[in-house]
Structures are given as C-alpha cells and as structure tokens.
A protein has these predicted regions:
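ATP-dependent small-molecule kinase phosphotransfer cores
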Residues: 32-126, 203
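Conserved lysine of the Walker
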Residues: 18
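P-loop (Walker A) phosphate-binding loop of NTP-binding proteins
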Residues: 13
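NTP-dependent small-molecule kinase module
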Residues: 26, 142-217
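Hydrophobic anchor at the beta1->P-loop junction of P-loop NTPases
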Residues: 10
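Hydrophobic positions on the alpha1 helix immediately C-terminal to the Walker A/P-loop
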Residues: 21
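A glycine- and Lys/Arg-enriched "phosphate-lid" helix/loop adjacent to the NTP-binding pocket
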Residues: 103-175
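Extreme N-terminal, non-catalytic leader segments
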Residues: 1-6
Length: 217
C-alpha cells in the first residue's frame, strides 16, 4: 500500500559532498514549508546508531562482507519501523542520507557479494517501502578520496572503515551506483559533483522541485 508521504534519498561514494548537499536541501525544503523528517543510514535510531559505530569503526577489520551486509539491514529494519514508515504515514517528506541503494553499491558491488543476496534481504526488510526519488552524487573516486582525506585532516579525525578502503573498492561502489541509475532511470538521478557546491545544489533543487510538483498534484 502506497503511503501518503514522499521518500527522498541522497547517495554517493565518500567524498562527493553528499552530506553537504543533503543539509542544504533539507534547509531549502523546510523554507518551502514542507514537513521534513531528516534521517540517515546506517543509524537514525538508538539501535541503528549503535550498529553504525560498529560498522564504521576502523578497528572492526575482521568483519566479513556478509556480516557487514546483515548489520546494515538490521539497522535498516529498526530505522524503517521507528522512523521512516511512521513519517510516511504522517504524510511527511522523509529525507535520508543513504538508504538501501548504499547496500547494493557497497556490499553488492564493493564487497562483491552480488545483487541476488542484497535483493533477497531487501525484499524481507524493506518490502514495498522504497525511495520515491534518489539523487546519486557522482565523482571520480580518486578525486572523492582526496576530498575525504582533506576533510579528515581538517577535523583531525580517524579514517573510517569505508574511507580507508582501496581506490579499486570505491571504483566498484561507484560502478554499482551507476548501474542502479541505469536500471531505474525514473527514480534514480545522477548529479555530477565535480562542480562548485552552489551549482550542484541548484541542479538538485530543480530535480526535487520537479519531483514534488508531479507528486503533489
């Protein structure tokens, strides 16, 4: 059954500026008067944030690809039950910094688990609750990783498990995101992130405005 709210997700490999664009879009939608539920993955709930710490901790080096995928979907199950579905039922616009496409890109392609196992888990956990619009921030992995490393230096923070992965890993993840976009062109829009922040945000706003206009008629 289709819920009354709308579900927008932002995706992309680390270093694309995704979180910056997410915050700007969130502020813009609120200015327009939309009731927005802002959330993220992994996380979004108390249980989900605990799982997030395990997943991103650089000391979790021995975690297997399958364990990583199952933990992602455990956090997602809690997130859907506590946050996403209730907000959609209230008629809100749900905006999530990553959702299930990240599992397909990172675990399906990056970890090479394949698409079948990710889809099987997704059917069980997400079912019919899928994003209505997904914006993928796209950038060459070599450039994105340099950006991410610069951010870590500015914040004096440790590299997380995913940011510490090889260039080849991030190339596979990017390939995954672009494959999803080719398979679902109506839902998934690719936004080139190799431009000034304001220019990227302008394109994102245009895409979202067109989407909202279609769905609010």
């Amino acid at each position: 059954m289709k819920r009354p709210g709308l579900f927008i997700t932002l995706e992309g490999i680390d270093g694309t500026g995704k979180s910056t664009q997410y915050r700007r879009l969130l502020s813009y939608l609120k200015q327009l008067g939309y009731s927005v539920c802002a959330t993220r993955e992994p996380g979004g709930t108390r249980v989900g944030e605990q799982i997030r710490r395990i997943l991103l901790d650089s000391s979790s080096k021995t975690m297997t690809a399958l364990a990583e995928l199952v933990l992602m979907y455990a956090a997602r199950a809690q997130h859907l039950e506590e946050v996403v579905r209730p907000a959609l039922d209230r008629g809100q616009v749900v905006m999530s910094d990553r959702f299930n496409d990240a599992s397909m890109a990172y675990q399906g392609y990056g970890r090479k688990l394949g698409t079948k196992i990710v889809r099987a888990l997704d059917r069980i956990v997400c079912g019919m609750t899928q994003p209505d619009l997904t914006l993928v921030l796209d950038l060459a992995p070599k450039v994105a990783l340099k950006r991410a490393q610069g951010r870590e230096l500015r914040r004096s923070s440790r590299r997380g498990r995913f940011e510490a992965e090889s260039l080849k890993f991030h190339e596979h993840v990017r390939r995954g995101y672009l494959a999803i976009a080719r398979q679902e062109p109506k839902r998934v829009k690719v936004v080139k992130a190799d431009r000034p922040v304001d220019e990227v945000q302008s394109e994102i706003r245009k895409m979202v405005e067109e989407f909202l206009a279609r769905h609010r008629r």
